[in-house]
C-alpha cells in the first residue's frame, strides 16, 4: 500500500486486535455483576472546601467582572499545567470567544492548546472523555446555553459515568463553560 503497509501486515494487526477483543470480552463476561455497595466506589471525592472562607472583595484588589475572573482562572490553569487545552466554538485566536473572553489565550498558548471546533455540541462535550483518557485536561466551551442540549447526552451518559464504569481508569477531568444570560436568545439550534 502507498503508506508502506501491505495486506498481510493489516491482516496480522486485525488478528491481534480481534484476539485481544475476544480475550477481554471473555474476561468481562466472567466478572461478577456490580453490587449495590460498589455504587460509591470510583467516584470523585467531595471537595475539602465545604464552606466559604476569606474575603470576597479584598480591599487591596480592584473589582473584576465575572468574564475576566473566568479568563484569569483559565489562564492560571493553563500556565500551571501544559496538559490543559481550551477548545470550543469560536474560542480560537481569530475571535477569542463570542464575548472576546479568550482573546489573548491563543496568542499566549498557541493554536495547539487553544482552538476552534465545529459547531457540534455533542462532540465538544463528548470529546473530553477521550482527551482525559489520554491524560489531557480539556476546558471546553459551548457558545451559548441555548445550544447545550445535544451535548447533555454526552455529559449525562459518558462524562459523568466514565470514572465509575472504568473502575477509576478513565476519570474525566474537564471544565465545561456555557455562557448564559448575557444578551438575547438563540433558540434551540444555531
Where are these regions (language model features)?
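Generic detector of well-ordered alpha-helical segments enriched in charged/polar residues
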Residues: 1, 11-14, 18, 22, ...
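Thiamine diphosphate
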Residues: 1-30, 40-190, ...
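Helix N-cap / loop-to-helix initiation motif
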Residues: 5-6, 35, 120
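Terminal amphipathic helices with adjacent charged low-complexity linkers/tails
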Residues: 15-58
Amino acid at each position: 500500500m502507498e503508506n508502506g503497509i501491505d495486506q498481510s501486515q493489516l491482516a496480522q494487526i486485525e488478528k491481534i486486535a480481534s484476539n485481544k477483543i475476544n480475550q477481554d470480552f471473555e474476561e468481562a463476561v466472567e466478572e461478577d455483576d456490580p453490587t449495590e455497595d460498589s455504587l460509591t466506589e470510583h467516584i470523585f471525592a467531595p471537595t475539602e472546601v465545604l464552606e466559604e472562607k476569606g474575603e470576597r472583595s479584598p480591599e487591596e484588589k480592584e473589582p473584576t467582572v465575572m468574564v475576566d475572573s473566568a479568563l484569569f482562572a483559565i489562564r492560571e490553569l493553563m500556565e500551571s499545567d501544559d496538559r490543559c487545552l481550551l477548545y470550543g466554538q469560536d474560542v480560537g485566536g481569530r475571535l477569542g470567544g463570542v464575548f472576546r473572553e479568550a482573546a489573548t489565550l491563543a496568542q499566549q498558548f498557541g493554536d495547539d492548546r487553544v482552538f476552534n471546533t465545529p459547531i457540534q455540541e455533542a462532540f465538544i462535550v463528548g470529546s473530553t472523555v477521550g482527551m482525559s483518557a489520554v491524560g489531557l485536561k480539556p476546558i471546553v466551551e459551548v457558545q451559548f446555553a441555548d445550544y447545550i442540549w445535544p451535548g447533555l447526552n454526552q455529559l449525562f451518559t459518558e462524562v459523568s459515568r466514565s470514572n465509575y464504569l472504568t473502575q477509576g481508569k478513565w476519570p474525566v477531568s474537564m471544565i465545561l463553560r456555557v455562557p448564559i444570560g448575557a444578551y438575547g436568545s438563540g433558540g434551540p439550534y444555531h
